[in-house]
């Protein structure tokens, strides 16, 4: 027994010394601050290209590469500030944001996949740009937010990517926290905070009309519009009103009247919804279970694709 104790003590000492040696190994300071070699991969909507950010002159810039090719094209040449983010506007144009000297007043820019036709869309001093809706099915338009009128409040604008024209769609009184468009890119829903704690849904039939309050909920209640139906008349909504689990329902946005229950789970709240702009249909809903994500499919093709991916990528979480 004494010998065993000595062996254990010696082993413990060796392991401890090993850990101490690893702990004393210094990590170069620049490793914490240097740019990644490549980051932010995104596939173009048509699947022909992918983009990423990589260093050029010690600053993160945009690169585009055709799928199947080994050659990448740098399409921006920033040398003062890193690009803060990017997104595909359509199959041939990419949007990106950057600020000035770290002021976090991010401005929106655009450039073609070959680096031509660069545009500064929101180069306004001391004004910050946010993306409200990329309008995936409308190539030339995007909905953005600008605090141009009031530094503390973001108003919604429709931006024409071809000519840079900005059209203000509403004036935020200060308590609007979110906006929602229909499938034609029309801004028709607003989400506000009232009385400091309650949530209010506002609606309008057309952009020519003012927003009007439709429903106010407290912290115990949930009504969340996910997206409009393909005909833009109803909305798919997640709600727990009248039930103890959040369900997917068909709802009239003008009244918040529940028309039909589309899916509910006995154990879990609905946490996500999948809608295909290409197919113009609801494809799935998801719940967060205690062992992972639970999905219900409305589209058999989508289910088959995901099943095949899960088989090929066993052990990975596919989102």
Enumerate the predicted regions with their spans.
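Peripheral, non-catalytic segments that deliver or gate enzyme domains
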Residues: 33-39, 45, 57-62, 77-84, ...
